[in-house]
């Protein structure tokens, strides 16, 4: 399990589509200390399954034994143990050594790390009201726990002394990097501040821990409460029978027999918008989506956003940075706001230009059908499908019967991993589950046990939106741990007896998230700090996006894209259509993404004075206009009030990471094609030089070790249809 304190120092939050949920790190103020020897703690220690290392294979969590009442006592005991361990290190009368200081800190906090891994993963994947209350209570306490460590002058003095003599310590490369990371992370966490400023920092961190927790809980509540109730089946014309049955089941579960409920996904756009023929219902669904957190109710996120932005800006200045974005980006591969602004600005104008051309094509169809209206945001997905049908003779309903979930996973995702890396998978039905829908697999590399993979595919009210990977057990040679990782999706579960048929986007997401899982499974490092996805935010999305290329690789596609009823492979003519349409609608896709990325940057590049925003909605509109991406038919992928990535998910000033990583991905795609594609020797090269090394080597050096040079941007421009030749 990753040491939660050092996870904080390295990453500072949840990776929304990537790695382990970690204790909130934007918090502080010391909680009242409860001694682990108290009556409650002693009783909990004798019966609490969170307090001991799991005896299941790979230390897999005993989900069937966990109860809500176990968590708070386990957190209290874990923090008490961790404080005692850190106190022994800080007060050690012996001169600091790498082992008695740095390695000792890596070994500390095991109980707390174990509790945190389970708890924060469950609050994302399968929460309830009691877990939410515990989350709100424990988040500021954990932040205070972290602050007490990183702001301890004695501890930092030992780290600094070692850092200053690092050239004489005879450390190997990974140990040298570990020492350097500890030193830098302590400084970034405020270790060099005065005592008075440390107190201010703790107060800021405590505020942020509470605010970011509140933001995410509001998003989940609003997403559930904003689901659209439909009175008649006729209004759902265009949805397939499986989707209609799922909508009926959702309504029945809410006591609305005879009606239908369209649940919302986390993005502004909703899948049903592509097929619903009823324009009024499309408008209702779209507006329900984009007004989340903006309805003036008790879950309105506008005041929460304003407070988060202000406190982050104030904290950045206290730490010596002009803005929160400047602080965050210093520890990434981008390094500066100027570099990020340059990339986003370089892409914005051509992306919007492509989107306008795409809109013109759709308007022609509307006019030809005598629609009598101008294309609106709720029309885009529907008429994009019409254009795709017209231009490529292709529509989603023709594709979905070939994308059955089990086949996509086992004959697609797992097959590609076998061909590239020699992986094999054995389902473990004997291991406990936190929800009946999950599947658990033991993973083998050339027949040798590698780790555990948990697959949690379906949307439910207890699960946050989106898709992500997390870790329950991080690989570490220091502890002898093998990884236990999980992928979470939000696929709508069909009615009983109906097949689970995926959209093209859902297939891509399944491959994407498994790219993160591979990053965790292949980790081969000594220290927990460097395990798996413990890399900069703008690098962590690289392995996941790179894995997407195999979804449409001919040999892989032929192995999994088979009709769910007949078993017949997807016809070659249909495959050719899919390949021909790969760049279709890229103007929209790039613009909606860039709009959200630019919003994230504008919010977080504010100085403390500029951050005093009174009207969140007006600020958002001005920001989009100033960036040249305020094109009404293409809303941001996330509007501010439900932008969990940046206001609660660890991607603050970091949502640009997807397009930044895609520069590497497009270049990597070319490398595989140049070297024969889906071959074991290619997979081994990529695994050994990049996937297995986690954060133990500087991120761009890993890329150079793999590719032999720095990345170039031209493949991305071609891939996104942003060059003249590729724009149509």
Residue positions per predicted region:
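Short pre-active-site segment immediately N-terminal to the catalytic Zn-binding motif
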Residues: 492-511
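Short His/Asp/Glu-rich catalytic/ion-coordination signatures at enzyme active sites or charged loops
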Residues: 55-70, 119-138, 161-203, 263-303, ...
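C-terminal motif of bacterial Sec signal peptides marking the signal peptidase cleavage site
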Residues: 15-16
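C-terminal, non-catalytic "cap/extension" segments appended to globular domains
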Residues: 32-67, 77, 237, 246, ...
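Intrinsically disordered or highly flexible coil/loop and linker segments, enriched in small
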Residues: 80, 84, 88-95, 111-128, ...
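N-terminal helix-rich structural modules
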Residues: 26-241, 672, 728
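Active-site-proximal, well-structured secondary-structure segments within enzyme catalytic domains
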Residues: 174, 178, 210, 217, ...
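Bacterial N-terminal signal peptides that target proteins for export
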Residues: 1-6
């Amino acid at each position: 399990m990753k040491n939660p304190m050092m996870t904080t120092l390295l990453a500072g939050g949840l990776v929304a589509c990537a790695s382990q949920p970690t204790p909130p790190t934007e918090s502080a103020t010391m909680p009242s200390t409860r001694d682990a020897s108290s009556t409650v703690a002693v009783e909990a220690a004798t019966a609490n399954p969170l307090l001991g290392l799991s005896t299941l294979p790979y230390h897999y969590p005993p989900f069937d034994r966990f109860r809500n009442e176990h968590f708070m006592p386990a957190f209290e005991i874990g923090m008490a143990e961790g404080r005692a361990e850190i106190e022994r290190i800080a007060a050690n009368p012996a001169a600091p050594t790498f082992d008695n200081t740095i390695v000792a800190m890596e070994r500390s906090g095991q109980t707390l790390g174990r509790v945190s891994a389970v708890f924060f993963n469950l609050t994302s994947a399968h929460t309830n009201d009691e877990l939410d209350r515990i989350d709100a209570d424990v988040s500021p306490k954990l932040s205070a726990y972290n602050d007490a460590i990183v702001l301890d002058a004695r501890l930092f003095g030992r780290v600094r002394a070692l850092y200053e003599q690092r050239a004489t310590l005879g450390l190997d490369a990974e140990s040298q990097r570990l020492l350097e990371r500890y030193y830098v992370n302590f400084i970034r966490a405020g270790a060099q501040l005065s005592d008075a400023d440390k107190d201010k920092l703790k107060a800021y961190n405590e505020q942020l821990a509470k605010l970011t927790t509140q933001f995410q809980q509001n998003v989940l509540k609003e997403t559930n409460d904003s689901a659209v109730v439909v009175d008649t089946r006729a209004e759902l014309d265009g949805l397939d029978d499986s989707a209609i049955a799922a909508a009926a089941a959702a309504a029945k579960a809410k006591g609305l027999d005879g009606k239908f409920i369209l649940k919302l996904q986390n993005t502004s756009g909703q899948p049903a918008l592509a097929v619903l023929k009823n324009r009024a219902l499309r408008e209702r669904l779209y507006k329900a989506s984009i007004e989340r957190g903006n309805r003036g109710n008790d879950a309105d996120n506008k005041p929460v956003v304003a407070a988060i932005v202000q406190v982050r800006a104030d904290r950045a200045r206290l730490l010596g940075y002009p803005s929160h974005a400047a602080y965050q980006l210093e520890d990434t591969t981008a390094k500066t706001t100027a570099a990020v602004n340059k990339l986003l600005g370089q892409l914005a104008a051509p992306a919007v230009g492509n989107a306008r051309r795409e809109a013109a094509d759709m308007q022609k169809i509307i006019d030809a059908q005598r629609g009598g209206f101008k294309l609106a945001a709720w029309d885009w997905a529907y008429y994009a499908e019409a254009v795709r049908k017209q231009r490529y003779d292709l529509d989603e309903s023709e594709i979905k019967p070939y994308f059955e979930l089990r086949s996509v996973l086992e004959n697609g995702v797992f097959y590609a991993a076998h061909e590239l890396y020699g992986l094999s998978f054995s389902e473990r039905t004997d291991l406990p589950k936190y929800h009946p829908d999950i599947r658990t697999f033991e993973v083998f590399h050339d027949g040798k046990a590698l780790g555990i993979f948990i697959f949690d595919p379906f949307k439910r009210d207890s699960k946050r939106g989106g898709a992500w990977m997390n870790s329950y057990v991080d690989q570490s040679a220091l502890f002898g741990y093998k990884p236990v990782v999980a992928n979470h999706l939000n696929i709508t579960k069909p009615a009983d007896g109906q097949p689970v048929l995926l959209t093209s986007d859902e297939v891509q997401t399944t491959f994407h998230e498994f790219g993160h899982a591979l990053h965790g499974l292949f980790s081969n490092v000594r220290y927990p700090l460097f395990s798996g996805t413990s890399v900069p935010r703008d690098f962590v999305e690289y392995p996941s996006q790179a894995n997407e290329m195999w979804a449409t690789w001919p040999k892989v596609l032929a192995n999994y894209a088979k009709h769910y009823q007949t078993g017949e492979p997807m016809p070659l003519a249909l495959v050719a259509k899919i390949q021909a349409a790969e760049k279709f609608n890229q103007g929209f896709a790039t613009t909606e993404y860039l709009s959200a990325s630019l919003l994230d940057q504008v919010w977080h590049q504010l100085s403390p004075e500029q951050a005093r925003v009174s009207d969140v909605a007006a600020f958002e509109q001005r920001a989009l206009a100033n960036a040249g991406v305020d094109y009404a038919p293409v809303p941001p992928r996330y509007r501010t009030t439900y932008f969990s990535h940046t206001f609660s998910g660890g991607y603050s000033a970091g949502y640009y990471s997807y397009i930044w990583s895609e520069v590497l991905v497009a270049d990597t795609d070319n490398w595989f094609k140049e070297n024969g594609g889906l071959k074991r020797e290619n997979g081994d090269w990529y695994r050994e030089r990049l996937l297995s090394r986690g954060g133990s080597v500087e991120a761009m050096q890993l890329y150079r070790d793999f590719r032999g040079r720095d990345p170039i941007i031209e493949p991305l421009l071609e891939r996104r249809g942003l060059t003249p030749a590729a724009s149509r």
